[in-house]
From Swiss-Prot:
It comes from the Bacteria. It comes from Photobacterium profundum (strain SS9). Binds 2 manganese ions per subunit. Its EC number is 5.4.2.12. This is 2,3-bisphosphoglycerate-independent phosphoglycerate mutase. Mn(2+) 2 binds at residues 13, 63, 443-444. It is an enzyme of class 5 (isomerase).
Length: 513
């Protein structure tokens, strides 16, 4: 069999386009390869946020949303909008998974624990959903409602949690029941890279009220954390308990509702509540009445989900498999789930003909300490796969722009972009050497805005700006403007001379000659 000439899609995570060069790590980095590609190859900008990816208008994109839209070849109605709509329609308050779980605890006189990322950021959760769950528990008769706050500072400004905490203090006062019971940064509660020592801190706080600090109010806990120079993301385990209040530790018969809807950073803390969990020794294992996931975090987590995934038929991965094509998915640990699970529309298992390759992300506290991450090793494997002649289609994600962008350290983000540029040069050379085709894009922006232009503070969140799309291959092809992420799969099928399934409603972004 002759060697295949692959079509590779390289996703530069967090590599957005912004006209303003100020505090723009991408524009100000020394990137001769990317500059040359923009000057000499077909390229355009495409949308990766808001309505174009199934989010509310103006809402910044994120990796889960981006990869789901890319892989689906159609705009996918995201969990954020789906859940928000259900609250507005009233369906949320009759959701069977939620009502059953709450009523089990309420009828036994036990507590309803509501936990999640306390944030208006809309990436992993939304505090409006958390407020609705609290109101629902109160209306159903819960007397003990405990809110466990994971603080953001990553998809929101680094010190922005106070407004949210005050909002919920006011809500509990209005309801006349319930309280905020704990605070902890998402660094501990929402790890996704098997840093079980961090997860253990959060688990002990939630299950046993074991904390580094105990204070009498949420705002006091936050103020103390700031005085220790801890931004929201890194706030240490803090119990909120005023004198005379009983502990909010979880006990037998309690119910837990986990209000994050994005799966990747919800899995580890959820697994810590499973009966057969062994990644660290648990000091307390309450026999909960129910633990409800807002969405399904993984197929092998056997817990109820309030909003199970909608099934996406004939995603790019499934369609390539049906057509007998060989495909490779490759990334570092940090974005491995995105090029596999999310790209496949929430399908955990590989399709026939799909190979997965994982490169371990470096074990550092924060990625500004190693901005190149594992890009050199990833590139070595990617180049070998391109030249190996085995695969028809290759999907690769480089996490650097996003993961280093999230640290808010500008110089490190510049170094990350420069490291990537060298890697892209090797990939382009490999593609050309085998007569293949290459598309370079991003799932959302991040590193192009390292300072918030409104506040002047460090900007660690994603952006709602467009992302590049570059094509290396047939010089006769030109790219259309006005595209979006969901146009990539039909475009790739067209480039591969494969028919496009009816479910893919995205447009082909080439003016085919």
């Amino acid at each position: 069999m002759s060697a295949k000439k692959p079509l590779a899609l390289v996703i530069l995570d967090g590599w957005g386009y912004r006209e303003d060069n100020s505090d723009n790590a991408i524009a100000n980095a020394n990137t001769p390869v990317m500059d040359s590609l923009i000057a000499n190859e077909a390229n355009t900008l495409i949308s990766a946020s808001g309505f174009d990816v199934g989010l509310p208008d103006g809402q910044m994109g994120n990796s889960e949303v981006g990869h789901t839209n890319i892989g689906a070849g159609r705009v996918v109605y995201q969990d954020l909008t789906r859940i928000t709509k259900s609250i507005a329609d009233g369906d949320f308050f009759e959701n069977e998974a939620l009502t059953t779980a709450m009523d089990k605890a309420i009828n036994a006189g036990k507590a309803v624990h509501i936990m999640g990322l306390m944030s208006p950021g809309g990436v992993h959760s939304h505090e409006d959903h958390i407020a609705a769950a609290i109101e629902m528990a109160a209306k159903r008769g819960a007397e003990k409602i405990y809110l466990h706050c994971f603080l953001d500072g990553r998809d929101t400004p680094p010190r922005s949690a106070q407004n949210s905490l005050e909002r919920f203090d006011a809500l509990f006062a209005e309801l006349g029941k319930g309280r905020t019971a704990s605070l902890v940064g998402r660094y501990y509660a929402m790890d996704r890279d098997n840093n079980w020592d961090r997860v253990e801190v959060a688990y002990n706080l939630l299950s046993a009220a074991k904390a580094d600090f105990t204070v009498d109010s949420a705002v006091a806990g936050l103020t103390d954390a700031y005085s220790r120079d801890e931004n929201d993301e890194f706030v240490k385990a803090t119990e909120i308990r005023a004198e005379g209040q009983e502990s909010a530790a979880m006990v037998d018969g309690d119910t837990v509702i986990f209000m994050n809807y994005r799966a990747d950073r919800a899995r580890e803390i959820t697994r810590a509540f499973e009966a057969d969990f062994t990644s660290f020794v648990r000091t307390q294992t309450p026999a909960l009445a129910e633990f409800v996931m807002l969405t399904r975090y993984a197929a092998n987590i056997k817990l109820p989900a309030a909003f199970p995934p909608a099934t996406l038929k004939n995603t790019l991965g499934e369609w390539l498999s049906k057509k007998g094509k060989k495909q490779l998915r490759i990334s570092e640990t940090e974005k491995y789930a995105h090029v596999t699970f999310f790209f496949n529309g929430g399908v955990e298992d590989e399709f026939d003909g799909e190979t997965r390759s994982l490169v371990a992300s470096p074990k550092v506290a924060t990625y500004d300490l190693q901005p190149e991450m594992s890009a050199p090793e990833l590139t070595e494997k990617l180049v070998a796969a391109i030249k190996g002649g085995e695969f028809d289609t290759i999907i690769c994600n480089y996490p650097n722009g996003d993961m280093v962008g999230h640290t808010g350290v500008y110089d490190a983000a510049v170094k990350a972009c420069e490291a990537l540029d060298g890697c892209i040069g090797q990939v382009v050379e490999a593609i050309k050497s085998v007569g293949g085709q290459l598309l370079i894009t991003a799932d959302h922006g991040n590193a192009e805005m390292m300072i918030n232009p409104e506040t002047g503070g460090v900007h660690t969140a994603h952006t709602n700006l467009p992302v590049p799309l570059i094509y290396v291959g047939d010089k006769s092809l030109t790219l259309k403007d006005g595209g979006k992420l969901s146009d990539l799969a039909p475009t790739m099928l067209s480039l591969s001379d494969i028919e496009i399934p009816a479910e893919m409603t995205g447009q082909v972004l080439f003016d085919l000659k």
